[in-house]
Amino acid sequence: MTAYDDHHGPAPLDDAEEPSEHGMSRRQLLRHAGWFGGAVVLTVAGGEVISHVAGARDGTAEAATAPGGALRFVQISDSHIGFQGPANTDVVGSFTEAIHQVNGLGFRPDFVMHSGDLTHLSTAGQFDQVRQMMTGLRTDRVFTVPGEHDSIGDAGRAYRQTFGKGTLGDGWYSFDTHGVHFVALVNTLSLEKLGHLGTAQIDFVRRDLAGLPSDTPVVVFSHIPLFAMYPKWGWSTDDALKVIALLRRFSSVTCLNGHVHQLFTKTEGNITFHSATTTAYPLPEPGRAPAPTPQVVPARQLKDALGIRTVDYRRGDQQLAIKDERLA
């Protein structure tokens, strides 16, 4: 567990109305998504999602007016430190801007979660660089989960050497704050499958949740989505349904992931899934390219595809308020 105090793409393919592997057509996918920028404010209450597009200074989540005792945290994702390519020639610069944006929110987050692909090539130097950069975040705690780019060639050992203190197994863990139970999962170690949890981790989740009352709000972090967003590209977790079954009894469950480099929301009963954008480079919309490769957009539009996420919760309210903001 990392918790330290240092403080546009080609035309859609012509099967847009055919169901995909997970039962959603590509047109249905688009209805769930907020592609390439635009701050999307989402309120999760009673298993329903209400959303609208908002500017960075939208009044629904004013930074300085949090209710007393509220939990406020930030999700950042997919910084890909070490990436070199035309999709973003300065990922260090854009990640630095994201850190400055977090520090300029007008409040001190209770914690910051980086939901994976901290690095691009899993080198010791890249892990050290991103760790040093995140010490500049004005927060008491920073948590992480690994992405597949953090697990290249060594099943995540170098990642765990830098960010794995206090974790269990291959890097999973849980914690509680402000009446919310958080679970951080690792689903990036089987690169031939991409999204995979494994029996040991699923058993951990079973034991971890067993003693919790069903009215406990639960937030689950992972890198790859825990729902079948687009299995053809590895945007799914093959054994996630076993964890989802354990979460069904809770009245409010929110799953936050990275990996897909774009905003996406899906609700299934009491569980809402939110995919985050990136601080590095955009990926194509599902079905609009042969593969999920970095997309080159005009330089002036790049920041519209990058961003951060803030989440607010007040104890006693069965809701989370989620706001996605493009880089300023």
Q: Over which residues does each language-model region extend?
A:
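N-terminal secretory signal peptides
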Residues: 1-28
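Active-site neighborhood of phospho(di)ester-bond hydrolases with catalytic His/Asp-centered motifs
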Residues: 76-77, 112-116, 143-148, 221-222, ...
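N-terminal active-site segment of His-dependent metallophosphoesterases
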Residues: 17-18, 48, 52-128, 207
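Short, well-ordered beta-to-alpha junction loops that form the rim of enzyme active sites
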Residues: 187, 221-226, 258-260, 325
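N-terminal export leaders
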Residues: 24-50
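Extended active-site neighborhood of metal-dependent phosphoesterases/phosphodiesterases
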Residues: 59, 65, 123-217, 239-254, ...
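Short acidic, glycine-rich surface-loop motifs adjacent to enzyme active sites
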Residues: 213-229
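Surface-exposed cleft-lining segments at the edges of enzyme active sites
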Residues: 83-85, 118-119, 188-197, 227-232
